[in-house]
């Protein structure tokens, strides 16, 4: 079952709101991009010291009907395709004998191509407005305050937001 959301109506609800996103991983950055495209005031808070702090990590595959759909809506699908690598699959038994193979063919090359985690982060960061991401800000408490939220960070600083989206992990 697919649920359709009237995005124009939803974005109008956020037009005068300050939205905080906790986490500058793929989900947090994609959400920031989608909301910024619709004129929402976004700040992303990330515990990493800077965008190069996590140079390790493997690859991610974005499936056609989920991650690729989000990249499409964010206007970043072609950039993703430019850096992603189509992947074939071999299924083997316990002795290493190939039981079945799925080779990459032109018609399935974009089914779920792999992209380096850091390349994906760079694509998403470059799509955001300057100063959207505040680095080295680890959230330690989140408290309601009337119609707003108070975010307190490990460095004892605090910020206020109308809406908080937790996207860590």
PLM regions and their residue ranges:
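Glycine-rich FAD pyrophosphate-binding loop
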Residues: 36-56
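N-terminal Rossmann-fold NAD(P) dinucleotide-binding loop
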Residues: 28-29
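Conserved N-terminal helical subregion
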Residues: 4-19, 24, 34-36, 61-169
């Amino acid at each position: 079952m697919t649920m359709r959301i009237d995005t124009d109506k939803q974005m109008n609800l956020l037009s005068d709101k300050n939205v905080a996103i906790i986490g500058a991983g793929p989900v947090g950055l994609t959400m920031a991009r989608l909301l910024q495209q619709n004129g929402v005031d976004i700040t992303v808070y990330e515990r990493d010291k800077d965008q190069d702090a996590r140079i390790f990590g493997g690859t991610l595959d974005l499936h056609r009907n989920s991650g690729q759909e989000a990249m499409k809506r964010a206007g970043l699908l072609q950039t993703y395709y430019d850096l992603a690598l189509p992947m074939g699959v071999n299924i083997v038994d316990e002795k290493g004998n190939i039981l079945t193979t799925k080779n990459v063919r032109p018609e399935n090359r974009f089914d779920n191509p792999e992209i380096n985690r850091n390349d994906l982060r760079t694509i998403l960061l470059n799509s955001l407005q300057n100063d959207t991401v505040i680095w080295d800000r680890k959230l330690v408490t989140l408290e309601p305050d009337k119609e707003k939220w108070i975010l307190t960070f490990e460095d004892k600083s605090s910020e206020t937001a109308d809406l908080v989206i937790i996207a860590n992990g």
